């Protein structure tokens, strides 16, 4: 910054609150401007933020095992064990407790892959 602007800034820093308010009034009168924030800007900002929220794309998905036909239970159980890394008993409990989340908060590609594998084994799956 130049020496002149540095000097003005130092002088502004040394003003009391009353002197600063008086300076603002003088600047408003001299230049025909207003220091007040426009009301329309304050109201428009939250509306713009609200409009931007629905545009966000979901990044985490849950794979939900909805149902498993009795004759496909073993095949689905094997796939669930591969996907989750659960032991035999835990995977069996999960499959029998359908509808139940198999994987939660995973990427879209991983969720679609898990859904495809479980459906190929005979289970009914949804992604949320």
UniProtKB/Swiss-Prot annotation:
Keyword Cell division annotated: no
Superkingdom of this protein's organism: Bacteria
InterPro entries attached to this UniProt entry: Ribosomal_bL12, Ribosomal_bL12_C, Ribosomal_bL12_C/ClpS-like, Ribosomal_bL12_oligo, Ribosomal_bL12_oligo_N_sf
GO molecular function terms listed in the Swiss-Prot or TrEMBL record: mRNA binding; structural constituent of ribosome
Keywords annotated in UniProt: Ribonucleoprotein, Ribosomal protein
GO CC annotation: cytosolic large ribosomal subunit
Pfam families documented for this protein: Ribosomal_L12 (PF00542), Ribosomal_L12_N (PF16320)
Gene Ontology terms: biological process: translation
Family named by the database record: Belongs to the bacterial ribosomal protein bL12 family.
Function, as annotated: Forms part of the ribosomal stalk which helps the ribosome interact with GTP-bound translation factors. Is thus essential for accurate translation.
Protein name: Large ribosomal subunit protein bL12
Organism per entry: Trichormus variabilis (strain ATCC 29413 / PCC 7937) (Anabaena variabilis)
